[in-house]
Amino acid sequence: MSDNGGLAAESYWRDGKLHIQNHPLNSGKGSTYEGGIREPMIVSWPGVVKPGSKCDNYLLIEDFYPSILEMAGIKKYKTVQPIDGISFIPLLKQTGNPSKGRSLFWNMPNNWGNDGPGINF
């Protein structure tokens, strides 16, 4: 195992075990399969997020910036470039799904080879 989850990238760090730590999700760290991209998020925001609530919708790391701006009540701000993210506050408040119909895509220029972490091409 690597120091921060998933199987280590270097073959001499590995103990030969396949990706099973994310079962039943397919694959793990470094993969675009669900086991490599799906991470839990725990939120506590008294008066806004209902205790014990659960949301299965997705969001991206880019969504945190506009969400934090909205949480802080900042409506007018200048940026050097357009903001890529979408505020996920409607998901927290259970008032809507800003990700509905949103396409996700990744560029993975470095594919794993036959000695990769439990994956053979």
What residue ranges belong to the model's regions?
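Catalytic cores of eukaryotic secretory-pathway lumenal/extracellular enzymes that build
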Residues: R38-E39
